[in-house]
Design a protein with these regions (language model features):
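Short, cationic low-complexity segments
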Residues: 73-78, 235-256, 322
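Short amphipathic alpha-helical interaction segments
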Residues: 118-119, 269-282
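Active-site helix-to-loop segments that bind/position phosphate- or nucleotide-bearing substrates
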Residues: 1-142, 148-150, 156-174, 196
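Short acidic, hydrophobic short linear motifs in intrinsically disordered regions
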Residues: 253-266
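A short, conserved structural fragment
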Residues: 31, 284-295
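Glycine-rich/acidic phosphate-handling loop/turn and adjacent ATP-lid/helix
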Residues: 153-188, 229-246
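Short, cationic-aromatic polyanion-contact patches
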Residues: 294-319
């Protein structure tokens, strides 16, 4: 076990006494003492701080695999890395590898050349941490995988989500690996429960990127992040999905969707508010949002995610009964 990384991540000094380390790791449920006074590394200890996951029978196929392709298809694989360290001790290496393999956009500012990652760091970090934590460890022969293309990044983990994928942003979290989740949260590798997806969507909206795509495929979960591209190239279904995720984020933040918030989401000028109204009409037709009130013209209407209508109606009924 890479015990040094535990102390580095917890910002504690490494004890000089080996028994202090052993007792601390036993309290963390990373190791367990045998009757003969020797020690076993438990699955949690190996997953978090193992030097090589392939050294264990049960976790040998669980290292994070990162593949870089040239172009937008899988025909030309340019590089592949398999990072075998435990997820806590090896997370920084995983992120460094992803950043190195991610395509860059070149910009000039004040005569200086600057390279910026095509995919924002916060969503990438959160999605990779989620894939490591929420994977199904009973699924044999497959582990978390990160595929990087010129125009997108796909993060896949074995195991279907435990909550409805349409409610990732708003539903109370559920984890099939609670001990690992708690440990990685405490070590600062992932967000507190329930706010990871908020941060992902908030960052995506801030940069006016296409909405991430969430898919459940053959008992695996795949999330796709897209590089920036003009609004005119987004399909109607992509715009509808972006509006739905925007509505979920607004709901979590205690507010509603409006023409103004949609203009901000897509970078639409105020004089083109009719375009935002058309996008909202498409989302209404698709059934992903509903009107929050019946007052005001199209420009001033407020909208909620489709599933929020029932709770709104119940609140209004309760108020009228009172």
């Amino acid at each position: 076990m890479n015990y040094e990384s535990y102390y580095a991540l917890t910002k504690m000094t490494v004890p000089q006494d080996a028994m202090v380390i052993l007792n601390q790791f036993e309290n963390e449920q990373l190791i367990q003492q045998r009757d003969d006074q020797s020690w076993d590394i438990l699955n949690l200890g190996a997953l978090a701080f193992g030097r090589n996951l392939e050294d264990t029978d049960t976790l040998g196929r669980k290292p994070a695999r990162i593949v870089r392709y040239s172009g937008s298809g899988r025909w030309h694989q340019s590089e592949e890395e398999e990072l075998k360290a435990g997820y806590a001790s090896g997370f920084a290496e995983i992120m460094d590898c992803v950043r190195r393999l991610t395509p860059k956009n070149e910009t000039f500012n004040g005569g200086f050349r600057k390279q910026e990652s095509r995919f924002p760091d916060v969503p990438v970090r959160e999605l990779i941490a989620n894939a490591l934590i929420h994977q199904d460890f009973t699924a044999r022969g497959v582990g978390p995988m990160i595929e990087i293309f010129d125009d997108r990044m796909e993060v896949l983990n074995p195991g279907a989500p435990l909550i409805d994928a349409r409610l990732f942003i708003t539903a109370p979290p559920k984890s099939r690996n609670e001990a690992l989740s708690k440990l990685l949260r405490r070590l600062g590798i992932c967000e507190e429960q329930g706010i990871g997806w908020d941060r992902i969507v908030q960052e995506i909206e801030l940069l006016q990127l296409p909405a991430p795509r969430i898919e459940v495929i053959h008992d695996s979960t795949r999330i796709t992040l897209y590089a920036a591209r003009p609004l005119s190239t987004m399909s109607p279904s992509e715009r509808v999905e972006a509006i739905y995720q925007h509505a979920c984020l607004q709901y979590v933040n205690g507010t509603t969707v409006t023409n103004a918030s949609i203009r901000k989401r897509f970078g639409i000028h105020q004089r083109n508010s009719a375009k935002a109204s058309r996008f909202l009409a498409d989302a209404l037709t698709a059934g992903v949002i509903v009107t929050a009130d019946s007052n005001g013209g199209r420009k001033f209407k407020k909208y909620l995610p489709y599933w929020a209508q029932d709770s709104t109606d119940q609140n209004m009924t309760a108020q009228s009964d009172a």
